[in-house]
Structure formats: C-alpha cells, structure tokens
C-alpha cells in the first residue's frame, strides 16, 4: 500500500479518504453510497439560478458562482473523514486547489518537507474534507470554496495530475495515473 497519496478533483476525494485511514473496503462503500444517492448530496443554488436568466437576458452582470453550493457534499466528506485535520493523515498527502484571487495553486499537505514550487503555495492548516471539497469544486458547477483568505476551485485547473507536487512534498518514487 502507498505511503503517500495525492489527488486532484475527484481524485482528491480518493486520496483524502485513504489518508484519513479509511479502509479500502469502506471507501468502496462510500463511493457506492454517493453513486446511489448522489442527489441527496447536491444543494442547487436556486436563488442564483433564478437570477441568472433575467440577468443574462438584460445584459446585467451575472453573479452565479456555481449551480451547486457544495455544502451537503462537504458535510458528507467531513462525516467520512471523521472531521480530521490534515496533520492527522496516516500517510503523506497532497491535494491541490486553485485560488481564484491570486491564480496560484494552493496545496493542502501534511508534509513538513514541501519544497518551493513556482506559483504554488503550501498550507498545513485545514480539515481533510475542506481540502477535498475545494479541489473538487469544478468551476461553474460548484461554487468556489472560501477557506481563510483563499477562494478555491478544482485543482485540475492547474495540476490535473499532481504527481510532481507529491514529489515536491518529499515523496519517494511516484506512480501517477492520469485518467
């Protein structure tokens, strides 16, 4: 089994669950639950959607940040990870997200040896579920996640395959899968 994991977007959920110490069999159950009852974890931004069409038709500024708020999915992810912080991860972990304000990649990690990377900032202070949700917030679909001073979206915007970031965080040999 790996001693370090990284993931972007949906991969951040797999990486975060694994890093939380969840057995693979339980991860499979969680994914089946999400697949079978996915609508239960979606919370559409109805007020934003209702304002979208009139604003579009009248040429006014559109303020809809995403069709789905993401709060219900975040709650589910927090439940699955038992509210653990990054530093409670059982393996080295890297989860990238992108800050809409600066354009930089923000990497959530528990690695104390994360090395400098151009246009990358590292943070150690977050809940696993927050990092997973931020990295999974596909722009236009999910609203960006506000964490501290950052406004975060899907890490795949800049790092679709985060193997290099995992290496920069001090991981040994890296096997990367890009799907």
Each model region followed by its residue ranges:
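Patatin-like phospholipase
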Residues: 1-8, 16-179
């Amino acid at each position: 089994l790996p001693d370090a994991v990284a993931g972007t977007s949906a991969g951040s959920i797999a990486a975060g669950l694994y890093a939380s110490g969840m057995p693979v069999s339980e991860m499979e159950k969680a994914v089946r639950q999400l697949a079978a009852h996915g609508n239960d974890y979606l919370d559409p931004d109805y007020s934003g959607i209702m304002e979208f069409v009139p604003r579009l038709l009248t040429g006014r500024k559109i303020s809809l940040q995403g069709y789905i708020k993401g709060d219900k999915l975040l709650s589910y992810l927090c439940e699955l990870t038992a509210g653990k912080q990054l530093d409670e991860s059982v393996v080295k972990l890297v989860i990238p997200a992108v800050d809409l304000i600066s354009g930089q990649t923000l990497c959530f990690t528990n690695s104390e040896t994360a090395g400098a990377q151009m246009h990358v900032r590292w943070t150690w202070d977050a809940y696993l579920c927050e990092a997973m949700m931020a990295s999974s917030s596909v722009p236009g679909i999910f609203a960006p996640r506000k964490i501290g001073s950052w406004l975060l979206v899907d890490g795949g915007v800049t790092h679709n395959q985060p193997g290099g970031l995992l290496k920069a965080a001090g991981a040994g040999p890296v096997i990367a899968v890009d799907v």
